[in-house]
Amino acid sequence: MNISGIKDCYGCGVCATVCARQIIDIALNENGFLEPRITDEGKCTNCRLCVDVCSYSHKELSLKASCVKSFAAWSKDAAVRRKCSSGGVGFEVGRTLIGEGYKVCGVRYNAERNRAEHYVATTIEELIPSIGSKYIQSYTVDGFKAINRNEKYLVTGTPCQIDSFRRYLQKFKKEDNFVLLDFFCHGVPSKLMWDKYVHWAEKQVGSLTYVSWRNKFTGWHDSWAMAIDGSEKGESVKWHESYNLSIREKKSFLNTRLSQGDMFYRLFLSDACLGKACYEKCKFKYENSSADIRIGDLWGTTYQDDEKGISGAIAFTDKGNNLLMKANLECVEHPLSVVAEGQMKECAHRPFFYKKLMTLLKDNSLDIEVIMLRSGGYLKSVSYTHLTLPTNREV
């Protein structure tokens, strides 16, 4: 038995990581989502490892835990807090563990390959590209395969990625070597949509060299913003005005926000083109997690006047709680209802025009501006301060 019959799954890539025969490939399907395929059935030994580590194939989570403590949290380092999407908890956890001899498997955006991808960082400098949210599906395989199970790691990812990865660690009895961190996940949009958005951006700034999905130029509550560096030479951009932490030369620069009608965010936050599993089979909303720590924006009324950024942080294990206490963080304990107030309580609902939108996204002759004109009237109104509004179900 293997994962050959699985379609429209989470695309976490752990099956490809665990396969000793190296016959599982993770690639984009026709709708622009990662999924596995067996490249040579004849070499399969039916060891079942790929199925055993597959979160999509199990109803229960791999960690039977409940919230130990929940916090509002933010970095004590003002520069870190300013550059991170919310409060900087993820970076501070990584920085603390690197100081203790851990490596970090996090996510960066690879502009040359136009994808988010997992990679291994061993120094603080190498950790910097992991700063900030990346609201597209991450290719995990190379990063996960680079991990040595006998060493100590922090591994971050979406809840489904982390649930599968914990199953992988349990198979080899290596959980003690790892700290696992996930986040409140909205779902992942189709790569077809992202590719069209990139094409639109490149017409303005040339080939992309860096992308940031969030910035606080106008405050944390208006931080749903794309900040993009292009290859074309442009006006000088001061370092503190760019979200690229490594900018060193004149580059063209694009900044577009949800509050100004940014097309990526209009489609993404309207739940218009998420993966099938995000609509139908996500079991990780609210406090359901297999991680030691879950993080995300602490939206809601308690910190509605804060514009520097506040993270919600939930410890599901004593390991996670102890780590939050010793990291360079200001932590204020709150009930879970406060920490997760603005987060999704259930799966997104597939809109009735989903199939039509996917057809438009597959049409190579259509730019994203045309697609927005044809579908914009169907998109729900999205408030950038509260993202759990209802939408029409598919009929």
Language-model-detected regions and their locations in the chain:
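Flanking helices and flexible, charged tails adjoining ferredoxin-like Fe-S electron-transfer domains
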Residues: 42-149, 339-356, 366-374
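Local cysteine-cluster metal-coordination motifs and their immediate loop/turn environment
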Residues: 7-21, 45-56, 161, 274-286
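Conserved small/polar residues in nucleotide/adenosyl-binding loops
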Residues: 385-391
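Gly/Ser/Thr-rich loops at beta-strand to alpha-helix junctions
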Residues: 85-88, 111, 155-165, 187-189, ...
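Ferredoxin-like iron-sulfur electron-transfer modules
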Residues: 1-13, 24-46, 74, 260-266, ...
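A short alpha->loop->secondary-structure connector
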Residues: 171-182
